[in-house]
C-alpha cells in the first residue's frame, strides 16, 4: 500500500515537471516572438492561492502597442493568449481598470507591464 502511494506520488511529480517544462517552452516561444516586435514591458501579479497573471506588451517607437501576451491560471495548462482590445492603442491612453474591469490581478499586471524598465 505504501509503495503504491509512493509510486503514484513520483508519477505525479514527474508529470508536473514535464507539463511545467512544456508550459515554459510555450511561453518562451511566444515571448521571443513578442521581443522581435519592439520594446517589451512585462508585468506579473502575485498571489499564493489566486491565479497568477503575466502580461507582456510590445511597444513601437511611438509608444503604440504592437502585440501582447497574456497568461492567467493556476495550473500548467494556462496558455499564452493575446489581448486584442489594446493592440494599436497608445500606451499613455491605456487604463487597466477599463481593460479588465472585474479582474484586479490582471489590472495590476498590466499596470506593471506599462512601466518599462530602462536598461
Curated annotation (Swiss-Prot):
GO molecular function: DNA binding
Record flagged with keyword DNA-binding: yes
GO biological processes: phosphoenolpyruvate-dependent sugar phosphotransferase system; regulation of DNA-templated transcription
Keywords attached to this entry: Activator, DNA-binding, Phosphotransferase system, Transcription, Transcription regulation
Pfam families: GutM (PF06923)
Stretches assigned to coiled coil: none
DNA-binding region range list: 23-29
Keyword DNA repair annotated: no
Superkingdom of the organism of origin: Bacteria
Biological role stated in the UniProt entry: Positive regulator for glucitol operon expression.
Protein name, entry field: Glucitol operon activator protein
Organism field: Escherichia coli (strain K12)
